[in-house]
């Protein structure tokens, strides 16, 4: 077959497919209208840089997992706040029935515009999510959490009844159904997940996430979030030192990590990140306990500098802008290349 005949055959096949399934159902990759991946900020400057595209990608599935009280819900509430700032509509599927509206409001979430559902079963939760995503009106949907998506058969059964992998089957079926709708509507679907321990593991990490393996494969980005220490004011604990690791990333190189502070009552401390990244990039000078910007001392001690940046937002925004401009030069934000994941 000559090249001309091949081109005609392909053109005829494409025309037939478009006639059957609609315009845009098949095309050459270069003809796609949106080639660049859009992103929504996570609310953490360091994590935005670690993700490589300035935030979480639109039209993809995201998994955020970690131990209890590690900051999973706090991070997702910051995601909602950032999406709403861009004019996006967000939905929260609260399967754990534990969302605190007052805390969400403190983190910048417009609770009057946030759609919330507290379903009774896993099937109901995922059907609601599917309907909202298919509407094309939702920009971000949060499912909190995968562990709380209890199958109807388990709820209606007796305590102690064996339910072999029913949750894993439910998740596998739901993700097969959801993934095309998520991509087509450019919606961000964020699944919060918990950690469990595998029994009898002799080598490697015994930790695993709930809901089977389907979410690991369908997720474009997987974020591991951990509490690594406390922030104290004298004897009182006022926050948590937090480390996040991007263990899977289909839109940028994975395995990058970032550290930030989560302050109780106010969420991720942007000022703390600006100081740390500013020092790392030589934008902010540190001499002993003193910090300087443009040869002007801005405070002694990290907490005092954080307060200074809160009181002088124009300087904070200026440093943040320079950090984002220089972020392409950061090849290692506490990057750990010794660990690998073959998802």
From Swiss-Prot:
Pfam families linked to this entry: RecA, RecA_C
Annotated family: Belongs to the RecA family.
Record keyword Ribosomal protein present: no
Disulfide-linked positions: none
Lineage: Bacteria, Pseudomonadati, Pseudomonadota, Alphaproteobacteria, Rickettsiales
PROSITE patterns (UniProt xref): RECA_1, RECA_2, RECA_3
Gene: recA
Alphabetically ordered keywords of this record: ATP-binding, Cytoplasm, DNA damage, DNA recombination, DNA repair, DNA-binding, Nucleotide-binding, SOS response
Any one Gene Ontology cellular component term annotated for this protein: cytosol
Binding site for ATP: 66-73
Entry GO MF terms: ATP binding; ATP hydrolysis activity; ATP-dependent DNA damage sensor activity; damaged DNA binding; single-stranded DNA binding
Glycoprotein recorded as keyword: no
Superkingdom: Bacteria
Location (main, coarse): cytoplasm
Organism: Rickettsia africae (strain ESF-5)
GO biological process: DNA recombination; DNA repair; SOS response
Cited InterPro entries: AAA+_ATPase, DNA_recomb/repair_RecA, DNA_recomb/repair_RecA_CS, P-loop_NTPase, RecA-like_C, RecA-like_N, RecA_ATP-bd, RecA_C_sf
The protein, known as: Protein RecA
Gene3D superfamilies linked to this entry: P-loop containing nucleotide triphosphate hydrolases
């Amino acid at each position: 077959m000559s090249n001309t005949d091949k081109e005609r055959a392909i053109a005829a096949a494409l025309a037939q497919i478009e006639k059957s399934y609609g315009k845009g159902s098949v095309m050459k990759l270069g003809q796609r209208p949106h080639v660049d991946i859009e992103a929504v900020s996570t609310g953490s400057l360091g994590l935005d840089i670690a993700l490589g595209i300035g935030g979480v990608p639109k039209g993809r599935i995201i998994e955020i997992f970690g131990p209890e009280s590690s900051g999973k819900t706090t991070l997702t509430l910051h995601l909602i706040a950032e999406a709403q700032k861009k004019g996006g509509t967000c939905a929260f599927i609260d399967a754990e029935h534990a969302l605190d509206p007052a805390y969400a409001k403190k983190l910048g979430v417009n609770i009057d515009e946030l759609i919330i559902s507290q379903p009774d079963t896993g099937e109901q939760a995922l059907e609601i999510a599917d309907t909202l995503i298919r509407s094309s009106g939702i920009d971000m949907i949060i499912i909190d959490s995968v562990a709380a998506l209890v199958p109807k058969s388990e709820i209606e059964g007796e305590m102690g009844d064996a339910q072999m992998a029913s949750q894993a089957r439910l998740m596998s079926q739901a993700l097969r159904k959801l993934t095309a709708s998520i991509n087509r509507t450019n919606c961000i679907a964020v699944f919060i997940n918990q950690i469990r321990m595998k029994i009898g593991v002799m080598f490697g990490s015994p930790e695993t996430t709930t809901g089977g393996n389907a979410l690991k494969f369908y997720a474009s980005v997987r974020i591991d979030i951990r509490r690594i220490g406390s922030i104290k004011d004298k004897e009182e604990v006022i926050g948590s030192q937090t480390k996040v690791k991007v263990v899977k990333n289909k839109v940028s190189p994975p395995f990058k990590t970032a550290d930030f502070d989560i302050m109780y009552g106010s969420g991720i401390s942007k000022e703390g990140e600006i100081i740390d990244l500013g020092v790392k990039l030589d934008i902010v000078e540190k001499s002993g306990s003193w910090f300087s910007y443009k040869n002007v001392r801005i405070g002694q001690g990290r907490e005092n500098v954080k307060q200074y940046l809160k009181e002088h937002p124009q300087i904070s925004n200026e440093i943040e802008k320079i950090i984002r401009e220089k972020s392409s030069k950061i090849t290692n934000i506490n990057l750990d290349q010794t660990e690998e994941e073959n998802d």
